[in-house]
Amino acid sequence: MARVTVEDCIDKVENRFELVLLASHRARLISQGASITIDRDNDKNPVVALREIADETLSPDDLKEDLIHSLQKHVEVDEPEPDPASMIAAGGVAAADSEEQDDLPETITFDQMSEEELLAGIEGLVPPEKSDDY
């Protein structure tokens, strides 16, 4: 890596550590087959990545977002929260429906379990057979 290339990049990304992270991420993308935005000139991938950052053919902010996204194992999706007024109205309707369904047999729900039911289930478990594996 030429010092001139790194010095050119410091104007675009002020923190040298962040520059190394972004350039290494871009170099990995290039080695995985991403298209380069400048002439290679027989340079290796890290130098090409630094030259892309220095020539501003890639936005450091976009690279940073891509790096963060690549490191995330679970991406949270922002879902709109339900309106409290509609939840209250839905609760009132559900209460009226439950009075009508008192004659029907009770269905088993897996979401709710009392402590006694949990303890009874645990006591009913059969311990695994001992083996010489451990």
Curated annotation (Swiss-Prot):
GO MF terms, alphabetically ordered: DNA binding; DNA-directed RNA polymerase activity
Keyword hit for Transcription: yes
NCBIfam families: rpoZ
Family: Belongs to the RNA polymerase subunit omega family.
GO CC annotation, single: DNA-directed RNA polymerase complex
Reaction equations catalysed: RNA(n) + a ribonucleoside 5'-triphosphate = RNA(n+1) + diphosphate
Subunit and interaction comment: The RNAP catalytic core consists of 2 alpha, 1 beta, 1 beta' and 1 omega subunit. When a sigma factor is associated with the core the holoenzyme is formed, which can initiate transcription.
Source organism of the structure: Rhizobium leguminosarum bv. trifolii (strain WSM2304)
Summary of the function given for this chain in its UniProt record: Promotes RNA polymerase assembly. Latches the N- and C-terminal regions of the beta' subunit thereby facilitating its interaction with the beta and alpha subunits.
Protein name: DNA-directed RNA polymerase subunit omega
Enzymatic class: transferase
Organism domain of life: Bacteria
GO terms, biological process: DNA-templated transcription
EC number per UniProt: 2.7.7.6
Pfam (any one): RNA_pol_Rpb6
InterPro entries: DNA-dir_RNA_pol_omega, Pol_omega/Rpo6/RPB6, RPB6/omega-like_sf
Alphabetical keyword list: DNA-directed RNA polymerase, Nucleotidyltransferase, Transcription, Transferase
Keyword rRNA-binding: no
